[in-house]
From Swiss-Prot:
One MF term in the entry's GO annotations: 3'(2'),5'-bisphosphate nucleotidase activity
Coiled coil: none
Cofactor: Mg(2+)
Binding, AMP: S242, H245, G268, K272
Carbohydrate-modified residues: N259
Catalyses which reaction(s): adenosine 3',5'-bisphosphate + H2O = AMP + phosphate
Taxonomic lineage of the native organism: Eukaryota, Metazoa, Chordata, Craniata, Vertebrata
Subcellular location: Golgi apparatus; Golgi apparatus, trans-Golgi network membrane
Residue ranges crossing the lipid bilayer per the database entry: 13-33
Entry's family note: Belongs to the inositol monophosphatase superfamily.
Organism for this UniProt entry: Homo sapiens (Human)
This protein's name: Golgi-resident adenosine 3',5'-bisphosphate 3'-phosphatase
Amino acid sequence: MAPMGIRLSPLGVAVFCLLGLGVLYHLYSGFLAGRFSLFGLGGEPGGGAAGPAAAADGGTVDLREMLAVSVLAAVRGGDEVRRVRESNVLHEKSKGKTREGAEDKMTSGDVLSNRKMFYLLKTAFPSVQINTEEHVDAADQEVILWDHKIPEDILKEVTTPKEVPAESVTVWIDPLDATQEYTEDLRKYVTTMVCVAVNGKPMLGVIHKPFSEYTAWAMVDGGSNVKARSSYNEKTPRIVVSRSHSGMVKQVALQTFGNQTTIIPAGGAGYKVLALLDVPDKSQEKADLYIHVTYIKKWDICAGNAILKALGGHMTTLSGEEISYTGSDGIEGGLLASIRMNHQALVRKLPDLEKTGHK
């Protein structure tokens, strides 16, 4: 028998050649794409600056957008805080003791507010560091979307985007400030807060009061929806202090400023900062100074620090040191906050409080 062979018609030869050319084209184009990606060229995700390169270094974020999301997060968290309080089912429990021996309480309001605030911010800005007072369950992957709308009051004050490297940003969330007062149904002291720090410096802050629905915000070198009062009493100031150690501050304050000084015990660091400002909330007390003499967490004070700084005020340790919002989550040196006063002169007046603050 004659050996069998394979015969191809002219059409078959043409098809075979076309298939071969197609294989060679894809191999060659893939090779070129790989070579281009080494130099950051090419526009497809995963092949250039818009893909892995951007994800690796976090890119940039717009502080104006972060302010808009921070306001929304504080309000959304506040909705949860108010809903739980009005249900009167708090599921209150203790996380342990504070350094002063008081119960460090947590409620459903804290947890649910934290969940809303954290995931709204994390979904909008996945590449930034977010520090929050309450635990975040790693298994909880809720996605809460932002509609990318910036409110008119923010656009009016912050007229242009403000881009910063994402890796320089740290967000501090307090999902429910004044939990002790919350459990006692002292609603006026309760706030939700968000702060954005850039390279450790507080740049924007939001303080929201869930029960009056008042929100204060400010951005350093940007704008604000709140302002300082027209005058402050520096000689015999009204001093707002923590309810838990008002007597400790009162003793030294009277020695420093005289017996005409008024001490205002209050709950919540957010409430105390608002006491220094022109706030159109009838439940808000007014003070000239805010003094704290014990250890305090940074999520309690960062938003207030940013707002005061944006308005020309100051918040420092009792020894006058600026507070860095990186690293550890608390400060040891007490706290002094003022606005439209000679802050360093006040620091020099309070040596005894500084010593007390380090005990």
